[in-house]
Amino acid sequence: MKSMPVAPIADLRVAQLIDANLDRAREGLRVVEDWCRFGLDREDLVVTLKDWRQRLGRHHHDSYKQARSTATDQGIGLSHPAQQERHEPWHVVAANCARVQEALRVLEEFARQPDPQLAASAAAIRYGLYDLEVTVLQANAGKKRRQQLQACHLCLITTSQSDLANNDLFRTVSAALVAGIDMVQYRNKEASDLQRLTQAKELASLCRKHGALFIVNDRIDLALAVDADGVHLGQDDLPTDVARGLIGSERLLGRSTQFLAQLQKAEAEGCDYLGVGPVNSTATKPERQPIGLAYVKEASKATQLPWFAIGGINISNLEAVRQAGAKRIAVIGAIMNSKDPAATSLQLLEALR
């Protein structure tokens, strides 16, 4: 829709103010738009941001531009120490979302009488940006998690043994995190929900402290309750589309697979990573027949998704698993039952890297 021409504003200061805030809003929208385009690959967000930017452009009449006087603008060249603290792209995006929202609010207030169409557009865009900012935040978190997942080598899955005291659990996981493991999957099928919640909260905190991913096994409700990075599901758990609808696109979704058809199905459904195994017999699931190295070799050729070989892997048989094509492994007993979990974690990491 075309913006109706407006008569020159009698108060030059208001015209200058409108001009400056139109510039500010359009520039800020472009910063966010370019991050959505190049950083997030989100065409849907780019289309919306471009539309808003062009709508404001149609309201940027010559009468506003002609009132511009950069030579006498006391705000030219001003900066703030916080600008030097924007180390991550998201910091830049968040700052520009706030910048646009503030500029739009100023336009609403000062354009209400001289240019009601501009005021209405500014209000509509401001409220839209509040929602879009949340979407960008979630997309950014999801992208960061997936980048971190790509760099993972070693995932520690916790034991379900009911006699493992909290302190022993936390001490073991903490030692492994200090050694440099990339990811922890919380698995405990024997504890009460309250015990699981207590343990998951502490483990999530430890993982955040050490910059590792934290995944909850099976329990989407628990993953959401502790703000985990994702959830890992077995073949008999919720379908992928249902699980994704619950955890959102910003969290990771993993799926265990035992043969190629399951792997291909999980990838097609949109899982972020896969478990491949059990490679060897394991005390965790003694009833499950090990699939050996043949499926590991198949998986290495069948998918570009990150995947973890799992099942009875330890330092003595790891090289054979690597030779079969595995770049990532998930272990339970090798670390959880180790007398020196930090040293064992280091050994495994060195062998993988």
From Swiss-Prot:
4-amino-2-methyl-5-(diphosphooxymethyl)pyrimidine binds at residues 185-189, 217, 256, 285. Binds 1 Mg(2+) ion per subunit. GO terms for molecular function: magnesium ion binding; thiamine-phosphate diphosphorylase activity. It is an enzyme of class 2 (transferase). Keywords: Magnesium, Metal-binding, Thiamine biosynthesis, Transferase. GO terms for cellular component: cytoplasm. Its cofactor is Mg(2+). It catalyses: 2-[(2R,5Z)-2-carboxy-4-methylthiazol-5(2H)-ylidene]ethyl phosphate + 4-amino-2-methyl-5-(diphosphooxymethyl)pyrimidine + 2 H(+) = thiamine phosphate + CO2 + diphosphate; 2-(2-carboxy-4-methylthiazol-5-yl)ethyl phosphate + 4-amino-2-methyl-5-(diphosphooxymethyl)pyrimidine + 2 H(+) = thiamine phosphate + CO2 + diphosphate; 4-methyl-5-(2-phosphooxyethyl)-thiazole + 4-amino-2-methyl-5-(diphosphooxymethyl)pyrimidine + H(+) = thiamine phosphate + diphosphate. CDD domains: TMP_TenI (cd00564). The keyword Heme does not apply. Residues 1-128 are annotated as: Unknown. GO terms for biological process: thiamine biosynthetic process; thiamine diphosphate biosynthetic process. Mg(2+) binds at residues 218, 237. 2-[(2R,5Z)-2-carboxy-4-methylthiazol-5(2H)-ylidene]ethyl phosphate binds at residues 282-284, 312. Pathway: Cofactor biosynthesis; thiamine diphosphate biosynthesis; thiamine phosphate from 4-amino-2-methyl-5-diphosphomethylpyrimidine and 4-methyl-5-(2-phosphoethyl)-thiazole: step 1/1. The keyword Transferase applies. Belongs to the thiamine-phosphate synthase family. Condenses 4-methyl-5-(beta-hydroxyethyl)thiazole monophosphate (THZ-P) and 2-methyl-4-amino-5-hydroxymethyl pyrimidine pyrophosphate (HMP-PP) to form thiamine monophosphate (TMP). This is Thiamine-phosphate synthase.
